[in-house]
Amino acid sequence: MSSGGLLLLLGLLTLWAELTPVSSKDRPHFCHLPADTGPCKARFQAFYYHPVHRKCLEFIYGGCEGNANNFKTIDECKRTCAA
């Protein structure tokens, strides 16, 4: 296979992986962590996955520390955690 064909295949596989929803059994463990504003005092709009409600919700992030269940956009949260 030519390098162009391999590059096309890699691109298609990447697109497929990006568009495939995450099932609950494949959901990363951090999606089950609670929203954590962290100790800093900034006020950034952020999103986290709420496992009981099974959806991404908004929260205010302080700007430092916190945990991995923290996304800049609701779409990023949905792609990562929502099934």
Curated annotation (Swiss-Prot):
Gene3D superfamilies for the chain: Pancreatic trypsin inhibitor Kunitz domain (4.10.410.10)
Record-linked InterPro entries: Kunitz_BPTI, Kunitz_BPTI_sf, Prtase_inh_Kunz-CS, TFPI/VKTCI-like
Annotated S-S bridges: 31-81, 40-64, 56-77
Keyword Cell membrane: no
Primary location recorded for the protein, binned into one broad class: secreted
GO cellular component: extracellular space
MF terms (GO), sorted A to Z: serine-type endopeptidase inhibitor activity
Pfam families: Kunitz_BPTI (PF00014)
Subcellular location as annotated: Secreted
Site annotation Reactive bond for trypsin: residues: 41-42
Keyword Secreted: yes
Tissue: Expressed by the venom gland.
Function field: Serine protease inhibitor.
Name the UniProt record assigns to this protein: Kunitz-type serine protease inhibitor 28
